[in-house]
Structure formats: structure tokens, C-alpha cells
């Protein structure tokens, strides 16, 4: 998958564009965690991409691109407008700067980028947060959570799965805005809970209590949909 991603990046560069690996992959590489989940971002617009590759799906500059029998999620550099539904922006504006694109992302640790040669590009302090195992938002946490309520559960999941600690201001923002997760679909809530409980059920349950999420939703309603055997055994003891 990585080799094909590098070839895709190389093809974009040969056509005058830039493209980087972003999101969880650079972070996990720095942590020594194996992952095959590769997301890309580029200054090429969806129109540009359509001239070079098979674009199977596109919305607001986020594309599913088929390349050598692999599907890649590729996003055009963008700024986002207001969020009315606590989940997605009402509009986006394409930009030409990687740094401008990274500013819209959720947590600083997820703003690390990687070029095709394996060189890290750190424009917002991601390496420092990763090295100190810190979860903090890009910008004001109250604003970032108000934009997208899923960030509450994502922050808790990263604490559980990666063993990172939460920034104190982010902790307060989560506790004060915890009820906003009710704006999320049950499907998205289940997906996040499943990821954290599958990794570390005891820590997941404790974190959900610490952040008072169990006061907002019936955690068991979601967990009964299916978990790993270890998680089911653990919950059965509660």
C-alpha cells in the first residue's frame, strides 16, 4: 500500500502538484506502530485529479481515488466554513498551502505530514506532542468540539488506544460539552466505542466514566452490538 501511495505521489509531482501522507500514518510511524491506513492531501483540485486518476467519489474536496487496484482517500487542501450540524462544515474553500490545510485538523498530533522520501513535515508542533504523548486540539478546544462533536470520542479513544494524556483545557471542554455527542448518529458513536473497547476495555470504561460520557449515553446499548471476546468477558464482570 505504501509503495503504491509513493507512486501516486510521484505521478502528481510529475504533473506539477504536491502531495503528502497525513493523518494517523505519520503519527503511528513515529510511534513505531504498524498501520496500512494511508490518507493523502494535495494541492490538486478534484478537477485536476479527475484528469489523472479514477475518482470514484468526491465531496467537498475529499475523494476516493482508485490507483493500481487500491483505493486512497485524498483531500484537496482546504479551509472549512461554519458547522451547523456539529459534524460537517457547510462549505469548504480550496487553498494552496499545506499549513492552511493542517490548521483545520482536530488534534495537533494528527498534523504531521510525510513526503514520498520519508521526511516528516511538522508545521504545527506535532512531533513535540507525540513525543510527550499529549492530546490537544489545533486551536481552541471549545470551538473545535462545537464544530464536530465526534472529536470528544476521538480524543478519548486516542487516550485509550495510544496511552496519551489529555491536555487540561481539552479535558474541561469535553466535560462541559459532553452532551453534544447526542448530535452524533448511533453508528458513529458505536464505531468509536468499538475501537476503544476492542483495544483496552478496562481503560475505555474508566475513561468514559471520568469524562462523564456514561451520564449522556447508555454505553451498554452500543457495546451489546458486538465486541472482542476479551471485552465482553470484562464487561460481564461489571
Predicted regions and their residues:
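Catalytic cores of the polymerase beta-like nucleotidyltransferase superfamily
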Residues: 1-238
Amino acid at each position: 500500500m505504501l509503495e503504491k501511495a509513493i507512486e501516486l505521489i510521484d505521478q502528481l509531482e510529475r504533473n506539477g502538484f504536491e502531495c503528502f501522507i497525513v493523518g494517523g500514518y505519520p503519527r503511528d510511524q513515529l510511534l513505531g506502530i504498524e498501520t496500512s491506513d494511508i490518507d493523502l492531501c494535495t494541492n490538486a483540485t478534484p478537477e485536476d485529479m479527475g484528469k489523472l486518476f479514477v475518482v470514484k467519489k468526491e465531496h467537498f474536496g475529499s475523494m476516493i481515488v482508485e490507483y493500481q487496484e487500491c483505493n486512497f482517500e485524498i483531500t484537496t487542501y482546504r479551509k472549512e466554513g461554519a458547522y451547523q450540524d456539529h459534524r460537517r462544515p457547510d462549505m469548504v474553500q480550496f487553498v494552496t498551502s499545506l499549513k492552511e490545510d493542517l490548521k483545520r485538523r482536530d488534534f495537533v498530533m494528527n498534523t504531521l505530514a510525510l513526503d514520498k522520501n520519508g521526511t516528516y513535515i511538522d508545521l504545527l508542533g506535532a512531533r513535540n506532542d507525540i513525543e510527550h504523548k499529549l492530546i490537544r486540539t489545533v486551536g481552541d478546544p471549545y470551538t473545535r468540539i462545537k464544530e464536530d462533536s465526534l472529536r470528544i470520542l476521538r480524543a478519548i479513544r486516542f487516550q485509550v488506544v495510544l496511552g496519551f494524556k489529555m491536555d487540561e483545557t481539552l479535558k474541561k471542554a469535553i466535560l462541559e460539552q459532553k452532551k453534544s455527542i447526542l448530535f452524533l448518529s448511533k453508528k458513529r458513536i458505536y464505531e468509536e466505542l468499538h475501537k476503544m473497547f476492542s483495544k483496552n476495555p478496562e481503560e475505555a470504561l474508566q475513561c468514559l466514566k471520568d469524562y462523564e460520557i456514561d451520564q449522556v449515553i447508555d454505553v451498554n446499548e452500543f457495546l451489546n452490538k458486538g465486541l472482542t471476546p476479551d471485552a465482553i468477558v470484562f464487561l460481564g464482570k461489571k
